[in-house]
Design a protein with these regions (language model features):
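Catalytic-core regions built around general acid/base machinery
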Residues: 41-46, 180, 225-236
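Conserved CoA-thioester-binding segment of acyl-CoA-metabolizing enzymes
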Residues: 1-45, 129-196
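Short, active-site-adjacent cap segments at secondary-structure transitions
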Residues: 96, 200-203, 249
Length: 312
């Protein structure tokens, strides 16, 4: 970890990571005292770095917005650096995407997320994760209608109806949700949309048995642009209420985070496991979650993969 004074000299090197080969940059800002011009220059330099930037902070908020992670102790810095080192490709793409998307319109931000996801689909970390998966299932669910809709007056109820598959975002579930959310976008007479799920949990995220099926990452990006539910949901957040329970993993929280209102039962918990798979949140989470809880917390949840209970 370098100190705040040394950083003023480091910024003479445009891309610091290229010269030292480090997987992340950790800086102790606890005693930083920069002029306004120095804050601007250092912030711009930090955001240009292709590796995650961790800041050890006390009450000093001068450089806060330029950081990818904020730590309170040196031990926390070491922990974050360890997680990043285990998945350096995915961690780097994650922070690059969340840096950019915060300043973009939602639909443009979703495109950036999909491009980052596609990049990692062709990467060594994801390939390594795939090689460790047991191919014991053909995936999906045998339920013919994984998404059910019922309208009462101006309210539309949408039910994730694949409990045997823990309501995983399979291709059929994805397409069903896109159809439902698209209907809402086209029908102004639908004033309220309530989304809930059958079974023991809201959604366990992507259907792992379908991961790696598409070998053409450019085509996979094209399909996401056409089919991902987030693009329809994100345009009308105020009309949506999500009722969550049990596991909300990956897409199981990435999509609800777009909604204007979320309620959760006491057994609800959240996780973003994608970085450990060599990927980034790809169902809209790099866009929806930072807008809800901030970029630092989103990056932390994604890189550590920690389980967050509803009490937290």
């Amino acid at each position: 970890m370098i100190n705040a004074s040394l950083l003023k000299n480091l910024i003479r090197e445009p891309i610091w990571a290229d010269s030292v080969g480090e997987v992340c940059l950790a800086v102790d800002f606890s005693e930083a005292n920069y002029s306004s011009d120095e804050v601007i220059a250092i912030s711009a330099w930090l955001q240009r770095q292709p590796v995650p930037v961790i800041g050890l902070m006390n009450d000093n908020e001068q450089i806060l917005e330029a950081l990818d992670f904020v730590a309170d102790t040196e031990l926390e810095v070491e922990l974050l650096a360890s997680f990043i080192g285990q998945h350096r490709q995915a961690s780097a793409v994650l922070v690059q995407v969340t840096r950019v998307t915060m300043g973009l319109p939602v639909i443009a931000a979703l495109t950036v997320e999909s491009l980052g996801y596609a990049t990692l689909q062709g990467g060594e970390e994801f390939s390594r994760w795939l090689s460790r998966q047991k191919k014991t299932n053909v995936g999906g669910s045998n339920i013919s209608s994984p998404v059910l809709m019922e309208r009462t007056g101006t309210e539309l109820s949408i039910l994730l109806n694949s409990p045997s598959n823990r309501n995983a975002l399979s291709v059929s579930m994805r397409d069903g949700l896109s159809e439902a959310f698209s209907l809402v976008a086209m029908d102004d007479s639908i004033k309220n949309v309530v989304v809930s799920a059958a079974g023991s949990c809201f959604s366990a995220g992507g259907d792992l048995t379908e991961f790696g099926v598409s070998k053409d990452v450019a085509e996979a990006h094209r399909i996401r642009q056409l089919k991902m539910p987030a693009q329809y949901l994100a345009e009308h957040p105020g009309r949506y209420s999500f009722k969550l329970h049990g596991a909300c993993i990956g897409a199981g929280i990435e999509l609800p985070a777009f909604a204007g209102h979320i309620s959760a039962s006491r057994d609800t918990f959240f996780r973003l496991p994608e970085v450990a798979m060599g990927l980034i949140p790809g169902a809209g989470g790099c866009v929806s979650i930072p807008r809800r809880i901030g970029r630092h917390r989103t990056n932390y949840l994604a890189v550590t993969g920690m389980k967050l209970s509803v009490e937290n």
